[in-house]
Curated annotation (Swiss-Prot):
PANTHER family per UniProt: THIAZOLE SYNTHASE (PTHR34266:SF2)
Pathway listed: Cofactor biosynthesis; thiamine diphosphate biosynthesis
Organism: Vesicomyosocius okutanii subsp. Calyptogena okutanii (strain HA)
Function text: Catalyzes the rearrangement of 1-deoxy-D-xylulose 5-phosphate (DXP) to produce the thiazole phosphate moiety of thiamine. Sulfur is provided by the thiocarboxylate moiety of the carrier protein ThiS. In vitro, sulfur can be provided by H(2)S.
Signal peptide range in chain numbering: none
Residue numbers binding 1-deoxy-D-xylulose 5-phosphate: 163, 189-190, 211-212
EC number: 2.8.1.10
Protein's UniProt name: Thiazole synthase
Length: 259
């Protein structure tokens, strides 16, 4: 299979690993891990991170430059469409007309599961207002297709609950979403280790977004490197086409003309 580049909202990206900017012990660790990951897209929680709203506080953009990275503002912490839309509008103002955003509307504080009703409502309004919407959603393929039909530029189903590190709990659903999508499908939430990231890519996903898996590791910088390599390995494995599973053994060497 021939690889095709990752294209989101008509822009081509080299890396299929997207990383978050939160949960690190300080901005220096954020920078070191981000550099090691070699990601092109860095997501930022507008309601929790200073990117210019507070002039007297450290600005994330001083170490994660928009000239080097594509900044992906997200609506983490929003529980309804109104707040999410307002947050996206603020991000557009702070980033000088930036239209690429990650829509994330949560259902409750215990599971952080997406509120699909509010997500669908907000997605339509944002698309109608010129935003390029990458959307966090459940692993329901019908919902995913509806979000695509609304005009979202990327579908981002969860692998498992945000920050849980449980990995991909329902791979069949993820494969169904990917099979029916005509926009990029990127895993968002639940990745815990490098093998989880590789598995997501082997399922055919176009990329993986993660934060906790790197930031909460004992060695975030080393884990960033592991995730970078896992994404590459998983993609190459998918493109290669794995061997068929068999019920019985099959010798690697021929069984004729033996000594």
């Amino acid at each position: 299979m021939i690889d095709i580049p990752l294209v989101i909202a008509k822009k081509t990206y080299n890396s299929r690993l997207l990383v978050g900017s939160g949960k690190y012990k300080d901005l220096n660790e954020t920078k070191l891990a981000t550099d090691m990951a070699e990601a092109d897209i860095i997501t930022v929680a507008i309601r929790r991170t200073n990117i210019g709203q507070n002039v007297n506080e450290p600005n994330l953009l001083d170490i994660i430059s928009p000239n080097k990275y594509t900044i992906l503002p997200n609506t983490a912490g929003c529980y309804n469409a109104k707040d999410a839309i307002r947050t996206c509008q603020l991000a557009r103002e702070l980033l000088g007309g930036h239209n690429l955003i990650k829509l994330e509307i949560l259902g409750d504080k215990k599971t952080l599961y997406p509120n699909i009703v509010e997500t669908l409502s907000a997605a339509k309004t944002l698309v109608d207002n010129g935003f390029d919407v990458m959307v966090y959603t459940s692993d329901d393929p019908i919902v995913a297709k509806e979000l695509e039909n609304i005009g979202c530029v990327a579908i981002m189903p969860l692998a498992s609950l945000i920050g849980s590190g449980q990995g991909i709990t329902n791979p069949t659903q993820i494969k169904l979403i990917k099979e029916h999508a005509t926009v990029p499908v990127l895993i968002d939430a639940g990745i815990g280790c490098a093998s989880d990231a590789a598995k997501a890519m082997e399922l055919g996903c176009d990329g993986v977004l993660m934060n906790s898996a790197i930031a909460n590791a004992n060695n975030p910088i080393l884990m960033a490197s592991a995730m970078k390599n896992a994404i590459i390995a998983g993609r190459e494995s998918f493109l290669s086409g794995r061997m068929m599973k068999k019920s019985y053994a099959s010798a690697s060497s021929p069984m004729v003309d033996l000594i």
